[in-house]
Amino acid sequence: WQITVYDAAFETPASIKGKVFYQIFPDRFCEGVENKPMPFPDRIYQADKHAEPFWQPNEVGGHLNEDYFGGDLKGIQLKLPYLHQMGIDFIYLNPIFEAHSNHRYNTADYLNVDPLLGTNEDFETLCAEAKRYGIGIVLDGVFSHTGSDSRYFNREGRYGEGGAYRDPNSPYRS
């Protein structure tokens, strides 16, 4: 089944009409900083860029998406001349905030770039450099939900004693 909701009077904004968007899954795009340390012990680095991603369920039947191929913000920055040459107008980035899966749709901290991708300053630099090439950056911001392994819920205890799961007085608990 399908639900389609739209405004019949909607018009594409002039600023993006006819523009070319290029979607990037940061971890798989380009590794700009090689041999970076893994910031969390449960992450697995795939040095072989042609290796098959882990897709089989683990011993308890879960799919953790914990294998990483090393793509990062500096890698995207390195490819800006190439992307410009291709004629793109916008880069649409899959989630970049700290998370504990390679797809990062289970955000753990909305205030910080995932350390495997770089720093907040690296993101600012990427945006400034992209602008020099006439390329805009659009974030896939998943602000409607977060992961249970996050500073907000903290089910795994990775973020100390705070979080709605561990602290009845948490500001994130309703």
Language-model features and meaning:
Residues W1-A14:
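Extended acidic/polar, glycine-enriched regions
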Residues A14-S15, N102:
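Short, flexible turn/loop "capping" segments at secondary-structure junctions
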Residues I3-V5, L93, Y110:
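Generic structural hydrophobic/aromatic packing signal, biased to beta-strands
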Residues P26-D89, I96-S174:
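Substrate-binding/active-site clefts of carbohydrate-active enzymes
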